[in-house]
Amino acid sequence: MKKNQVYNPFLPLYEYIPDGEPHVFGDRVYHYGSHDKEGGDTFCMLDYVCYSAPVEDLTNWRYEGVIYQAKQDPRYPAPQYMYAPDVVQGNDGRYYLYYCMGGDYGQGGYQGSVSVAVCDTPAGQYEYLGVVKNPDGSPMLKYICFDPAVLNDDGTIRLYYGTQYDYEERDDFLTNDFYLQDEMQMFGRSREEILSYPDSIMG
């Protein structure tokens, strides 16, 4: 069978799905990611959609439709935006979508958790399940939690996620020794390197 050349962009020009997470489930590749709105006021304004293609033909992408809507999360007030998600197949054979809610800068609060939705198929209609919890059963809350990545490591589900320390927004960030020591250790940078950035080591 003759195969076509794979090229970018592989999605339609009207689709903006950054932070992509491709996964092979069965004989298809499923592409998940955040969903930007053309001309939008900020990023991640649209609900999650999914595209898939046969593993053997990555030129033949199919629109699977909207798989999850921000309004399905009962815990978060408007504006409801969702940062980049990830999907993993659980040990029970179902598919779990991990995501973090976002919003306009300074709105909606920053103390968030990693939420979970579940579906019987990779690109079906996901339903809200709950939040990731600490061992004591309390919600795992992090300051500006975003872009979780999750994998099934031979039966153990491993979750990784991005975050930002709230002290990076404080007026005394560049003069507080505790904050500076934390940044130096986290990024492997000297005090001088940290202080050379006007806002934070993250730019």
Predicted features, each with a name:
Residues 1-203:
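Carbohydrate-active catalytic/glycan-binding domains of CAZyme proteins
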